[in-house]
């Protein structure tokens, strides 16, 4: 026969101790409802003592204490000597005291890590066993810890109960809110002992530490590139498979992972909360503001050891350094030019092949990269909705406007000519100073730009990498090939 305890919610003493007042209200309502159903069916032979307490409708914490007393009759309250907190279970008092003293009596036999209670040790052991007992019914994703599943389920419901008082942004977990708050406070509690660099989140700190160890155990079978994390390898492998599953609804641009899509979508929103105090320019991300501020300070802290070239950020330096490394760079088989990433090499190779796989259905114009196509399509609408606040000039897209705005930002003090980036401005300023730092080892001729030197060196090698498909004539420069192709058209 069905009894009350067959349908009751059976909490362990530890679980009961952790319930909040509103959770106890829910617990009480469900327990009483279950009992009323049994009573209606004539299956409740006698009223359990716990139900009697719950029917008194006392405050949830009174119910909690009395319910615990009902389940464990005759047990006295166990009180912490140093603090006023009391526990019905002695095991909970012991666990509480270990937290205060820092004692960690439960040790993992696999790796030696110690914990102050058995449940934390059990959760930790699942790292070694790979066990993930808590599964999401919505998407099938599994978790080691029940609380992680609860946080994950908010992704499906859209619930974000934790709100930042500073900017109003909401989060699905308290830990994410705590990490976000550090943007406002500037707090960086995780410091690298190796180089002294500090981080606001534990995950970025751990990721950084792998730079010092140099360990990259996850290798791409396609191009032999190595990664510190399996997730990074997985994202990278989509480059080879051309799989871009995550598409922006605003402009149609596809991405390899949801994180990149989310980051991209901020561009479409008008919100730019991070403003430069020096010039008033606003940014979507704090990292972009920090990098921009180095322009005003004239700082380029990240210097290349191989060629003395300096950069505003370590990301730009790392990308540049691949050019010097034969192992990590991507070499063009046609002209020998090296690139820091595989997509850059692919894009470059289309100059040799003349391939333009992305076609506009409206006018038939073709493009070598997919990113140009959505912006081109805006020109057919005839609308120029984006206005430059500096000069009033109108543009079809935010991309065109941003490209134009850089001309106002990077201006030559000598002739007031504008440039799209700092590197182009620096190269131009050498026209006024007469500086030519790039010298040809073959003939001693010097150049103001590195790309001019690279093109000049083809004269010595006799190499003409740019070939006309119509007549077979070869050229040193892509610009010369384009000019020549006008003869055939």
Curated annotation (Swiss-Prot):
InterPro entries hit by this protein: KRAB, KRAB_dom_sf, Znf_C2H2_sf, Znf_C2H2_type
GO CC annotation: nucleus
Keywords of this entry: DNA-binding, Metal-binding, Nucleus, Repeat, Transcription, Transcription regulation, Zinc, Zinc-finger
Any one biological process term the GO annotation gives: regulation of DNA-templated transcription
Transmembrane region(s): none
SUPFAM superfamilies linked: beta-beta-alpha zinc fingers, KRAB domain (Kruppel-associated box)
The protein's name in its UniProt record: Zinc finger protein 58
Organism: Mus musculus
């Amino acid at each position: 026969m069905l009894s009350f305890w067959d349908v009751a919610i059976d909490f362990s003493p530890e679980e009961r101790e952790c319930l909040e007042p509103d959770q106890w209200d829910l617990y009480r309502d469900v327990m009483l409802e279950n009992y009323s159903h049994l009573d209606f069916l004539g299956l409740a032979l006698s009223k359990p003592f716990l139900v009697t307490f719950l029917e008194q409708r006392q405050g949830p914490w009174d119910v909690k204490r009395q319910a615990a007393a009902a389940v464990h009759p005759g047990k006295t309250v166990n009180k912490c000597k140093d603090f006023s907190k009391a526990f019905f279970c002695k095991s909970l008092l012991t666990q509480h005291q270990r937290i205060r003293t820092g004692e960690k009596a439960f040790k993992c036999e696999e790796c030696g890590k110690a914990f102050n209670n058995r449940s934390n040790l059990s959760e930790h052991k699942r790292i070694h066993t790979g066990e993930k007992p808590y599964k999401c019914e919505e998407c099938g994703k599994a978790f080691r810890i029940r609380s992680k599943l609860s946080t994950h389920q908010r992704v499906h419901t859209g619930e974000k109960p934790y709100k930042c008082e500073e900017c109003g942004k909401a989060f699905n977990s308290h830990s994410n809110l705590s990490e976000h708050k550090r943007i406002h406070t500037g707090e960086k509690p995780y410091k690298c002992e190796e180089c002294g660099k500090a981080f606001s989140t534990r995950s970025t700190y751990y990721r950084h530490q792998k730079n010092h160890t140099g360990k990259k155990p996850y290798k791409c079978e396609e191009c032999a590139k190595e990664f510190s994390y399996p997730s990074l390898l997985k994202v990278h492998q989509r480059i080879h498979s051309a799989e871009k599953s995550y598409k922006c609804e605003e402009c149609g641009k596809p991405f390899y992972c949801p994180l990149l899509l989310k980051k991209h979508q901020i561009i479409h929103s008008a919100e730019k909360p991070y403003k430069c105090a020096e010039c008033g320019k606003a940014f979507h991300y704090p990292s972009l503001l920090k990098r921009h501020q180095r322009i005003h300070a004239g700082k380029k802290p990240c210097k290349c050891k191989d060629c003395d070239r300096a950069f505003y950020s370590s990301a730009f330096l790392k990308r540049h350094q691949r050019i010097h490394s034969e192992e990590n760079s991507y070499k063009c088989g046609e002209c020998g030019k090296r690139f820091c990433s595989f997509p850059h090499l692919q894009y470059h190779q289309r100059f040799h092949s003349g391939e333009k796989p992305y076609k506009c259905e409206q006018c038939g114009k073709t493009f070598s990269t997919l990113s140009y196509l959505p912006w081109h399509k805006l020109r057919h609408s005839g609308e120029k909705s984006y206005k430059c606040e500096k000069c009033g000039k109108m543009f079809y897209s935010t991309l065109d406007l941003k490209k134009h705005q850089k001309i106002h930002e990077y201006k030559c003090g000598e002739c007031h000519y504008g440039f799209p980036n700092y590197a182009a401005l620096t190269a131009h300023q050498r026209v006024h100073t007469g500086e030519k730092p790039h010298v040809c080892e073959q003939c001693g001729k010097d150049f103001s730009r590195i790309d001019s030197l690279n093109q000049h060196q083809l004269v010595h090698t006799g190499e003409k990498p740019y070939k006309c498909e119509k007549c077979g004539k070869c050229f040193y420069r892509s610009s010369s090939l384009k000019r020549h192709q006008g003869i055939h058209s």
